[in-house]
Structure formats: structure tokens, C-alpha cells
């Protein structure tokens, strides 16, 4: 079965559409730094908008990119790219962008959260679109410098000019994404699937599955060190195999015993009740319930996050993991 989506590549994107336009990248963290440098190296006019002078300000200067206070960066910008954390964007928008941006400037996002959940209400005369790279900022930069690119998603929320998609693809080309491929989506789809993946697999699901497996073995009297290797440490090797060869490639690489055990017991553990709760988690995302809770949590200083992190840091598996990582490092051959 082939991919059902159109995949945009370099031939579908034209940098000339945005050459000569002033691009303000807001934020200079992982993604902000990568985007700003890649767009600059693609021959585009880039400035960085920051709320205060500090380490990021000096880093931008050392990278050869002009840092400005956010208000100054956006006032002459034709394209404004939000690359600050989700929960910072609304305040930044209300205080430092909306009152100062010029009429008709494009608003660009790397994640749909604030637009989809209406935390930011964009002007009716602005094009609003998204380019969401499927990799961390350092990888976006590294691949670009090596002549490649990280795949991305592209979406248009508001197309006043009639050329929003074309400009989005030009930005995607500027950061190197069209070298790999850019898949069209919507703000709704990107936001909901991104949150779902984080919650049930990438962060929440994997974390709780590892911890539950480790604790089960320890409670049954097995050595914590052995339990850690079998339930947590070896996960990387399997994930690397899936990343490189897919799920079937991973299965071909493991022992027949592992294949049989995985195919039988895996469905016993991850059964229909788990799938039902996954759907419930998805409904919380789709209804906006999760977003409401997260905004409230953030406003209270993130007590759930702070307490949860403390719990993990003080857990037996974390203490054992710290010790075993030292052993692994000692055993690595000297380069």
C-alpha cells in the first residue's frame, strides 16, 4: 500500500516567493536556532526576536544572525515564525507580537496547539500556516548542513493571499525539509496526533510500561540491576531496529523465542481494555479537555509535572539506571 498523501519535494517549492521578505524567527532554542541558520543559509533575510538579552541573544550574534527585541523584530517582518514553547506563545502574542506586527504579516507555527485550541486568534488579513519538522532542532540543522533534510508536515489554517501553501513550502525548502519530503495535513490533525503520540506512546505509554515491568520483576525478588537491563536498558536497541527497518525488520532481527513470546504475551498485556483507554485519551484531546487542563496546570506552576519528575528521579529504577549507565560508559571502546 502506497502513502495516500501527496509528498512535496524540492521541485514543488520556490524560494523566490519569500526572497526579499523579512523573516522574524521568535525564539532561539532547539528549533529556533536551526530554522534561523538554515533559512539564512538558504539566502533569506532573517532576524531573531527575543524577549530579553541573554545567552540566546549572544548565541544568535555568534552565529551571525541579528537578534532584536521581539517588538522590534516583528514590526517590519513579513513572516513571523513562532518557535517558542507552546505555553509561552499566547502571552508573547498578546504582549509583544499582536500590538506591533504590521498589517498582513504571515504567522507561521511548528505545532498547531495554540491555533487549534484558539489560544491565539490571528488577524483576518494574515496568512496562517505551519511547517512541523519530524525531528529535533539539532538534527534539522545537521541534516541541512550535510545536504539532506528532515521530513516535515505542512498545513494551512488561513489563506488570505491565495499563496499560503506555496509560501509554507518555500519555508520548508528553506529549512531543508523538501529535500526529504513534506506531507500535507491540517492544524487539527497535527495537533491531535502529536499530543496522542506523546501521551500514549512516546512519553506516557513507554515510561509507564518500562516502570511497571521493572517494578514487577523487583517485587518478585529479581535483582534490580538485572531487571533494569531487561526492561529498560535494552529498549534502545529495539527502537533503533524499528527506526531503521520497521516493525517487521525488528522482528526478523530478534530470536524466535522473542518473536513467539512477543506475539502472544504482547497482546495479552496490551489488550482491548488498553485500546479502549487509548481511545478515551484521544477523545480528551479532541474535545479540548486535555488542553484546558494543561493551561490550568501551567498557570498553577505545573505542580503535577514537578511532583511527577521528582517521583521518577527518586525511584529505584532511576538510581539503578544511573549506576548501570556508568558501567556501560566504562565498557565503551576508546575512540
From Swiss-Prot:
It comes from the Archaea. Pathway: Amino-acid biosynthesis; L-isoleucine biosynthesis; L-isoleucine from 2-oxobutanoate: step 2/4; Amino-acid biosynthesis; L-valine biosynthesis; L-valine from pyruvate: step 2/4. It catalyses: (2R)-2,3-dihydroxy-3-methylbutanoate + NADP(+) = (2S)-2-acetolactate + NADPH + H(+); (2R,3R)-2,3-dihydroxy-3-methylpentanoate + NADP(+) = (S)-2-ethyl-2-hydroxy-3-oxobutanoate + NADPH + H(+). The keyword Lyase does not apply. Pfam families: KARI_C (PF01450), KARI_N (PF07991). NADP(+) binds at residues 28-31, 56, 86-89, 137. Involved in the biosynthesis of branched-chain amino acids (BCAA). Catalyzes an alkyl-migration followed by a ketol-acid reduction of (S)-2-acetolactate (S2AL) to yield (R)-2,3-dihydroxy-isovalerate. In the isomerase reaction, S2AL is rearranged via a Mg-dependent methyl migration to produce 3-hydroxy-3-methyl-2-ketobutyrate (HMKB). In the reductase reaction, this 2-ketoacid undergoes a metal-dependent reduction by NADPH to yield (R)-2,3-dihydroxy-isovalerate. HAMAP family: IlvC. Belongs to the ketol-acid reductoisomerase family. This is Ketol-acid reductoisomerase (NADP(+)). It comes from Saccharolobus solfataricus (strain ATCC 35092 / DSM 1617 / JCM 11322 / P2).
Amino acid at each position: 500500500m502506497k502513502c495516500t498523501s501527496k509528498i512535496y519535494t524540492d521541485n514543488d517549492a520556490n524560494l523566490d516567493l519569500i526572497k526579499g521578505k523579512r523573516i522574524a524567527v521568535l525564539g532561539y532554542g532547539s528549533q529556533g536556532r536551526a530554522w534561523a541558520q538554515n533559512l539564512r543559509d538558504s539566502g533569506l533575510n532573517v532576524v531573531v526576536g527575543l524577549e530579553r538579552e541573554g545567552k540566546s541573544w549572544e548565541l544568535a550574534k555568534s552565529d551571525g544572525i541579528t537578534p532584536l527585541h521581539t517588538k522590534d523584530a516583528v514590526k517590519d517582518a513579513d513572516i513571523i515564525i513562532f518557535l517558542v514553547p507552546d505555553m509561552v506563545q499566547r502571552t508573547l502574542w498578546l504582549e509583544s507580537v499582536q500590538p506591533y506586527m504590521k498589517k498582513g504579516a504571515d504567522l507561521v507555527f511548528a505545532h498547531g496547539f495554540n491555533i487549534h485550541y484558539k489560544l491565539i486568534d490571528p488577524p483576518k488579513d494574515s496568512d496562517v500556516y505551519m511547517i512541523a519538522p519530524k525531528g529535533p532542532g539539532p538534527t534539522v540543522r545537521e541534516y541541512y548542513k550535510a545536504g539532506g533534510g528532515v521530513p516535515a508536515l505542512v498545513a494551512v489554517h488561513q489563506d488570505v493571499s491565495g499563496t499560503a501553501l506555496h509560501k509554507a513550502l518555500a519555508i520548508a525548502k528553506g529549512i531543508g525539509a523538501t529535500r526529504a519530503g513534506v506531507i500535507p495535513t491540517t492544524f487539527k490533525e497535527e495537533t491531535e496526533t502529536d499530543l496522542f503520540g506523546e501521551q500514549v506512546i512516546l512519553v506516557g505509554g513507554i515510561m509507564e510500561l518500562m516502570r511497571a515491568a521493572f517494578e514487577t520483576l523487583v517485587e518478585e525478588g529479581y535483582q534490580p540491576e538485572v531487571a533494569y537491563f531487561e526492561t529498560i536498558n535494552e529498549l534502545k536497541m529495539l527502537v533503533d531496529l524499528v527506526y531503521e527497518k520497521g516493525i517487521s525488520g525488528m522482528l526478523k532481527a530478534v530470536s524466535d523465542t522473542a518473536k513467539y513470546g512477543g506475539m502472544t504475551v504482547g497482546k495479552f498485556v496490551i489488550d482491548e481494555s488498553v485500546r479502549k483507554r487509548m481511545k478515551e485519551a484521544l477523545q480528551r484531546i479532541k474535545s479540548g479537555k486535555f488542553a484546558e487542563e494543561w493551561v490550568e496546570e501551567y498557570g498553577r506552576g505545573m505542580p503535577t509535572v514537578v511532583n511527577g519528575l521528582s517521583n521518577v528521579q527518586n525511584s529505584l529504577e532511576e538510581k539503578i539506571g544511573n549506576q548501570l549507565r556508568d558501567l556501560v560508559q566504562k565498557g565503551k571502546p576508546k575512540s
